[in-house]
């Protein structure tokens, strides 16, 4: 998504694809590229009523949260709507470190839930006169799943401790 200087503001063209809760939102914080490189990224505030702004078809993530693509066709952004100019991106994303840890925790919880559902099934399902949890091949699968879950937990803990100490993501 590119922002080009136009009068006292900017013209923005491009798109954003995975924008959480976008079907219901009217105002958006949009990252734009003023020029190449990490120092060329900043952000603007955009309203759905702005000429050239449109939304795509609504879809859902696996957790049921809705999203839709956002399209910008030469949308004029007045200078009052420029939140961060070029170089502001580094400051703005520093707040995402905690969010990344939350996303990791959510994924770990989903993995644990799936493991427990599979375990209950293996403890009750019978095949050839035995519970399927008694078959060695099934036990290997459960061992591998548990190792992956615990490795994920340790990585999550390490990330949380390091983020609290101010280490970069």
Regions found by a protein language model. Give the residues of each.
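Active-site pocket-lining segment
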Residues: 143-165
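Charged, glycine-rich active-site and insertion segments that engage polyanionic ligands
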Residues: 168-169
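Glycine-rich beta->alpha junctions and the first turn(s) of the following alpha-helix
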Residues: 53-151
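Short, well-ordered loop/turn elements at secondary-structure boundaries
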Residues: 7, 24, 39-40, 66, ...
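A short core secondary-structure module
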Residues: 13-54
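A structural signal for short hydrophobic beta-strand segments in well-ordered beta-sheet cores
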Residues: 3-4
